[in-house]
Amino acid sequence: CWAIGSISGAMNEETEKRFLVTVIKDLLGLCEMKRGKDNKAVVASNIMYIVGQYPRFLKAHWKFLKTVVNKNFEFMHETHEGVQDMACDTFSKIAQKCRRHFVMQQAGEQEPFIDEILRNLLQITVDLSPQQVHTFYEAVGYMIAAQPHRATQERLVAKLMELPSNAWDNLMKQAHSNV
């Protein structure tokens, strides 16, 4: 899988598309055939790694990009060692390379995907460690930075910081009541 990821960009776009679709289908089939959580986690990590290495494909296929990110969010709840780290790292890589796609409203969508992500922030990050949450927030920050309209960008930042701000406010209230 490392070799597959390392040749990203080496093929023309159409060949890359056929190649990547075949690889992902085969890996998903392998994931279905494998027994045991350990084996499935290894295959899932490899799938995440590979799709994160092909931003050109992701940018050209919005529905696939959204599906990959949503699957990544599912992996953020997986407790098998290393899977959450890989999910957060892959999300960060995709966020950096495809940032504009998250802040623009895509065809067939009700809103930009960033709004959905921010609305579901707590549900997505609830099982992550503090360091993983940091990686997640940083990734969302990359997306927000790609928003060209300042007022919208400020609204998105406020929404992103809502949970930490509320936690801070509660901490301050608690500290004042203990004084």
Predicted features, each with a name:
Residues 1-179:
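Karyopherin-beta/Importin-beta family HEAT-repeat alpha-solenoid scaffold
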